[in-house]
A protein has these predicted regions:
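ATP-dependent NMP and nucleoside kinases share a basic, alpha-helical "lid"
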Residues: 92-94, 101-133
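Hydrophobic anchor at the beta1->P-loop junction of P-loop NTPases
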Residues: 3-5
Length: 187
């Protein structure tokens, strides 16, 4: 069974992945693998340089600020970058043999259609908590955080398309929710 973990920026997906790891479950981090593939794949580097400009890589190192600025300019830019990166990540996941994956933009990117997924788990959190988490974690302004949140599908839509929910509202403990999820999935 292939299980995808998703949720908006700042929802706490990484913490849920940590709890899963503590329970012996390795989760394929789509974002981390996308970054690794951009670092190691000459083909991806060439395609992105052609699309964005040669300055997106300096001595083979991705210039995140240039990529981010390009992505924030338009939805067409996001789709063009996704069309290059996501097929490579989907192929890499399929080759990995892992049964869990984590992707913040599972539905936004169409990644759920690029590879077989049996069940989807959505990590949710109130927007004010998400905003605070991202501002602290990334050291960015509230406006920039809201810009990134607006680039993703609304949390309600992601939840509607998911099979399970883990609520990360700083009130309900996460570990019991993860344990319950694992027991339900294993039935």
């Amino acid at each position: 069974m292939i299980i995808a973990l998703t949720g908006g920026i700042g929802s706490g997906k990484s913490y849920v992945c940590k709890l899963l790891a503590e329970r012996g479950i390795s989760v394929y981090d789509c974002d981390a693998h996308a970054k690794e593939l951009m670092r190691t794949s000459q083909s991806l580097q060439q395609q992105l340089s052609t699309l964005i400009g040669d300055d997106v890589f300096r001595d083979g190192v991705l210039q995140k600020s240039i990529l981010a600025a390009y992505l924030l300019r338009s939805e067409d830019h996001v789709q063009a970058v996704n069309a290059i990166i996501h097929p490579a990540v989907a192929h890499d996941f399929e080759q990995s043999g892992q049964t869990w994956l984590e992707s913040a933009i599972l539905f936004d990117s169409g990644f759920d259609k690029r590879t077989h997924i049996d069940k989807v788990v959505c990590v949710t959190a109130p927007e004010d908590i998400r905003i605070h988490r991202v501002m602290v974690r990334d050291g960015i302004s509230r406006d920039k955080t809201l810009e990134w949140i607006a680039r993703q599908l609304p949390q309600e839509e992601v939840l509607r398309r998911s099979d399970y929910e883990i609520i990360n509202d700083s009130i309900r403990p996460l570990a019991p929710q993860v344990d319950h999820l694992l027991s339900v999935i294993s039935e």
